[in-house]
Amino acid sequence: MPKLEQFEIKKYWQIFSGLKPIENKVNHDQVLPILYNSKLDSSVLNKIWFLADIDDDDNLDFEEFVICMRLIFDMVNKNISSVPDELPDWLIPGSKVNLIKERKKRKQIENADLPPKKEIKVDWYMSPDDLNQYEKIYNSCAKLTDGTITFNELSTKLSTKFFNISKTDLNKVWSLINPQNLPSIDRDPTFYFIHCLRQRNDLGAEIPASLPNSLAEVCNKKQLSYDLRSSQPPTKRKEEANEVDNLRDNGQNSSSDNSGSNVLSNENSIKQKYASLTDDQVANMREQLEGLLNYKKSEKTQGGSKLSKRINIRSITDDLDNIEQQVEVLENYLNNKRHELQALQAEIN
């Protein structure tokens, strides 16, 4: 690390004067633009600020400002690979030597009094206050058309709030709560992303290697894709319809067979399927079966000719439903492409 030159000190004085110091000191907010323009990790910048603020008053006089700027430039220009734990002697101003010695003594005493450091684990429980705070951060983020948030958007937002986390921390937690490596995540994983990083920032909690099973299910939840080229399997609506159709088939078979054993067998089969369904599926199934009952009643009263007409109408209705679903997918796909086109045009302009 080369020593300070006179031209450097003049350059730092020009920058210092431009910040409009009060009583020959600048505070953290005044220096903040310079810190962020360096593109260094917040953990690195915090360590530089701590080393430079020798008198621990949360302000920098000119001598301390010179230390701060020199360490930043050395890191940016790769003159040093990491911030030193202590200032080199040639960078300590003569007026600050005694303060440095006092700081070292305090640190030795504090370290001697500290109990052995225990590993802090992430607590995944979120209190109502936590949820309110995370909701505000979530609402302040720019979202994609499907309501999800990208890594860059979240990391930029959190870097202005959590100063003790590094880019490595951000990447680790993103991989943890995004095991499918999706380009963006929705609301629930976003909350867990913020919650984990907050404990890392405030408590120094260790980032876990895996999620609890209950959280893994939330973070592994698949997002609905509107890309027509996607190989995503059919939606849940179709799966539920298939289950109801299977139950309807069982009902039709039982009505065509008068034997008590077949009826009992079909009844047990229906009960087993019924027990495995969710509330939404049960409601959907009930609606379908009531429709089937009404259909059977009308079949007996109106005869075979009207039956064939109703079957044809049902077939046409199903076709219309399928076409309607395809139109919705195409409209969403068109809207996404329009947004992409607008973004490209904005970049060109």
Swiss-Prot record:
Residues of the signal peptide: none
Biased composition (Basic and acidic residues): 236-248
Membrane topology qualifier: Peripheral membrane protein
Entry-linked PROSITE patterns: EF_HAND_1 (PS00018), EF_HAND_2 (PS50222), EH (PS50031)
Residue ranges of domain EH in the record: 8-98, 130-222
Domain of life from the UniProt record: Eukaryota
GO process terms (BP): actin filament organization; endocytosis; endosomal transport
EF-hand domain segment(s): 40-75, 146-164
Entries under InterPro entries matching the protein: EF-hand-dom_pair, EF_Hand_1_Ca_BS, EF_hand_dom, EH_dom, End3
Name this polypeptide is given: Actin cytoskeleton-regulatory complex protein END3
Alphabetically ordered keywords of this record: Actin-binding, Calcium, Cell membrane, Coiled coil, Cytoplasm, Cytoskeleton, Endocytosis, Endosome, Membrane, Metal-binding, Phosphoprotein, Repeat
Positions of Ca(2+) binding: D53, D55, D57, N59, E64
Subcellular location: Cell membrane; Endosome membrane; Cytoplasm, Cytoskeleton, Actin patch
